[in-house]
């Protein structure tokens, strides 16, 4: 369960890193792997240019895929929490649903490295959160919620 908890944290952290790349670059920060950027012949400043952002797209997609792998493990962690601990299950499920919706918005964006404002999730996933409060006791229903959101992510 401890290793699953680590993946839970990595899923959310990697989502934040991927969502915040443009803003971080504007403030002189870059949390993408420097070694992998260098292998592509890129530095952080190159990502500010459309050509550099386009060349970094495979790395960005790979990191999105890695985040999804961590989300899969994080859901196993969440579903392992006893059903009677519904508050704890919701405390885990909601960030995961929001994170998956954020990844879906990032993959749907034509140039997530070039956005000027942070990507926000639309209202529909928020309704999914509300519904999850009624199905928190069911592993099948929570897993179905996650699967519906995950199915919208094209990596």
For each predicted feature, which ranges?
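Catalytic cores of Mg2+-dependent Asp-rich isoprenoid enzymes
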Residues: 1-12, 18, 22-155
């Amino acid at each position: 369960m401890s290793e699953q908890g680590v993946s839970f944290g990595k899923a959310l952290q990697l989502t934040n890193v991927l969502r915040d790349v443009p803003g971080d670059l504007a403030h002189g920060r870059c949390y993408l792997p420097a070694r992998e950027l260098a292998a592509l012949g890129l530095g952080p400043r190159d990502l500010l240019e459309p050509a550099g952002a386009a060349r970094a797209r495979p790395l960005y997609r790979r990191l999105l895929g890695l985040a999804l792998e961590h989300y899969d493990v994080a859901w196993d962690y969440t579903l392992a929490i006893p059903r009677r601990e519904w508050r704890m299950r919701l405390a885990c499920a909601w960030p995961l649903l929001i994170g998956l919706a954020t990844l879906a918005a990032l993959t749907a964006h034509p140039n997530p490295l070039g956005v000027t404002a942070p990507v926000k999730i639309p209202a529909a996933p928020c309704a999914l959160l509300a519904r999850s409060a009624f199905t928190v006791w069911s592993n099948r229903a929570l897993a179905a919620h996650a699967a519906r959101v995950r199915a919208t992510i094209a990596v």
